[in-house]
């Protein structure tokens, strides 16, 4: 993952390394792009220590910056791996459309000038549920040789008083996939695309055929499923 010094992973590794006196490497359930939030990221790490899980959690929260918190810590079986054992992930994208955004939520909600048609977006989203090749809705480069087939089990779009929530649950996601998927649905909501155009976009395998990559601040990894 390159230089992790100024990442959440890097901050935790630094504290654990000082605590144990040896190098520490964390295995996270998945990466999040810069600016994307994680409410319930999961990670595992192997360390040598006499401290209890509770003591480790308290030590981490004492030294971590205020915008990072360890909400649970427990000893796990030897073969547990946060990423390899994960069955799926739940992402939520929050968007304020056509109104005055909540200034206190500006770091967590994307402000969008145009009012969006939720019904049209829901019809489009129905075409994306299931197992498909999502290469067109990802930022993977042409040299990417691994499979770009992924399974989305659920997409829910809910209008709330001051925002629209897009909830996307799937077994795994490609680089920028959720943000591009939402960007494509938003263009449907704007009337720029037809709801039934989704299959053709997927079949094209062409990033240029899909919508914009939405800003990162509206996206949160809500849950890792096991």
Describe the role of every protein-language-model region.
Residues 1-226:
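Structured-RNA-binding interfaces characteristic of tRNA pseudouridine synthases
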């Amino acid at each position: 993952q390159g230089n992790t010094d100024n990442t959440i992973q890097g901050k935790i590794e630094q504290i654990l390394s000082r605590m144990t006196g040896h190098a520490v490497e964390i295995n996270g359930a998945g990466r999040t792009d810069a600016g994307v939030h994680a409410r319930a990221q999961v990670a595992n790490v192997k360390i040598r220590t006499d401290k209890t899980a509770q003591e480790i959690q308290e030590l981490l929260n004492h030294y971590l910056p205020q915008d990072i918190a360890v909400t649970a810590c427990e000893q796990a079986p030897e073969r547990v791996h946060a990423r390899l054992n994960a069955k799926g992930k739940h992402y939520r994208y929050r968007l304020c459309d056509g109104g005055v955004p909540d200034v206190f939520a500006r770091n967590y909600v994307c402000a969008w000038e145009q009012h969006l048609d939720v019904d049209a977006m829901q019809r489009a989203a129905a075409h994306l549920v299931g197992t498909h090749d999502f290469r067109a809705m990802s930022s993977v480069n042409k040299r990417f040789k691994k499979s770009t087939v992924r399974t989305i089990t659920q997409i829910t779009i809910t209008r709330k008083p001051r925002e629209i929530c897009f909830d996307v649950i799937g077994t795994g996601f490609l680089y920028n996939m959720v943000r591009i998927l939402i960007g494509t649905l938003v263009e449907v909501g704007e009337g720029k695309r037809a709801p039934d155009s989704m299959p053709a976009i997927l079949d094209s395998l062409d990033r240029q055929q899909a919508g914009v990559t939405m800003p990162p601040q509206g996206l949160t990894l809500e849950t890792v499923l096991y």
